[in-house]
Amino acid sequence: FKGGGPYGQGVTRG
């Protein structure tokens, strides 16, 4: 998903 990772900066994989 995007924007829902541990950073929330639009990461593709968290």
Curated annotation (Swiss-Prot):
Protein localization: Plastid, Chloroplast thylakoid
The keyword Aminoacyl-tRNA synthetase is assigned to this record: no
Superkingdom: Eukaryota
GO cellular component, as recorded: chloroplast; chloroplast thylakoid; thylakoid
Keywords, in A-Z order: Chloroplast, Plastid, Thylakoid
Miscellaneous field: On the 2D-gel the determined pI of this protein is: 5.7, its MW is: 14.3 kDa.
This protein's name: Unknown protein from spot 103 of 2D-PAGE of thylakoid
Organism for this UniProt entry: Pisum sativum (Garden pea)
